[in-house]
Amino acid sequence: MKKLENLLFDRFGLVFKDVSLLETAFTHTSYANEHRLLKISHNERLEFLGDAVLQLIISEYLFEKYPKRPEGDLTKLRSTIVREESLAGFSRDCQFDRFIKLGKGEEKSGGRERETILGDLFEAFLGALLLDKGLEVVKNFIYQVMIPKVEAGDFEQVTDYKTKLQELLQSNGDVEILYQVVSESGPAHAKNFEVSVSVDGRLVGKGQGRSKKLAEQEAAKNAFEKENHSCI
């Protein structure tokens, strides 16, 4: 836990008064269940709190940033920013994935890379930060870590190429679309995945990304652009 405390201070200038909150935020249910006799707290309640404060801060930001955009557009953009995949990416950016405590089974099954776990971890950290430091510090952290990517347009006009590819290919009948991980590279906190997509056994595209889902979308985009062009 000392290494995590050092990371938080060095990168974000954060020092927790109540380190037990930090400990709880980084404890997955699988770890707590394996150490039931020790009555260790896990991070689900903090995740609940963090989710609420994240929704509030992002909603306020979008409301002030885009005064002329309708409610529907703001809701879609907020959903993209706070979705599981996005929050998992922020966890990796902060190197939080290095410090989460997992049960042995969860660790062996790749839990440290699982987007559900990493997204929940990010929210749990925000919950712990809120209890320890208050709303303004949480807001500053979110503005430091998340908002630069929002303002860079990373979450605008997100296209679901997997769905677009499926609709294009299945317009002439049922086909089997298969996504496979070709390779993984990089350290645990900055993984890069390469994924291929094939249709009825025929390779139609490849893509890379910081997560399997992002790599699948890139592969689908690559395939969609080629297949759509061939249909013209």
From Swiss-Prot:
InterPro entries: dsRBD_dom, RNase_III, RNase_III_dom, RNase_III_sf. Transmembrane segments: none annotated. CDD domains: DSRM_RNAse_III_family, RIBOc. Residues 160-229 form the DRBM domain. It is an enzyme of class 3 (hydrolase). SMART domains: DSRM, RIBOc. It is found in: Cytoplasm. Its cofactor is Mg(2+). The active site is at residues 51, 123. Residues 5-134 form the RNase III domain. GO terms for molecular function: double-stranded RNA binding; metal ion binding; ribonuclease III activity; rRNA binding. It catalyses: Endonucleolytic cleavage to 5'-phosphomonoester. GO terms for biological process: mRNA processing; regulation of gene expression; rRNA processing; tRNA processing. One of its GO terms (cellular component) is cytoplasm. Homodimer. Belongs to the ribonuclease III family. Digests double-stranded RNA. Involved in the processing of primary rRNA transcript to yield the immediate precursors to the large and small rRNAs (23S and 16S). Processes some mRNAs, and tRNAs when they are encoded in the rRNA operon. Processes pre-crRNA and tracrRNA of type II CRISPR loci if present in the organism. This is Ribonuclease 3.
